[in-house]
Amino acid sequence: MNDRRSSVFEWLLGDWTLAREISGYATATGVARVFLIDAQTARYEEAVRISLAQGETLSGTQCYLFRREPEAPAKMRILFCSTAELFQSLAFQERGGIWQASARFVCGADQYDSEYILDLQSWQVRHAVRGPRKDYRIETVYRRATGAG
């Protein structure tokens, strides 16, 4: 990464604001924090306020583990917090100053095709979710929290 951090994993550490859209269903805003829990693992925690399309407002939280690949600075794995099972394995490539990775996760009959895009002050995650009863997109934009990073 170009901001003096040596890996994608290290670049993600810190405090973030987030804005999320779940196509046709909801929007969410909130905060996320990525912090080290050991030399190879960071914990991602988010707290959001969700506005459903029908007008109801809820709050929610989510957690993942980010595991670095020590010998490959552009690679990392995302694990579910509750089980430490693999969600997605990412191999970022730099294209014109932007770092991108894509991955797929299959859960039963549902498929999550994901794209991760990082630049110097923000990152995006886009999930296309498809299955027998699912067909929507989840798009989240993260920006460094003021004074962070």
What residue spans do the PLM features occupy?
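Soluble ligand-binding/transfer domains with enclosed cavities or grooves
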Residues: 2, 6-146
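Short terminal or interdomain "cap/linker" segment that borders an active site or interface and mediates
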Residues: 149
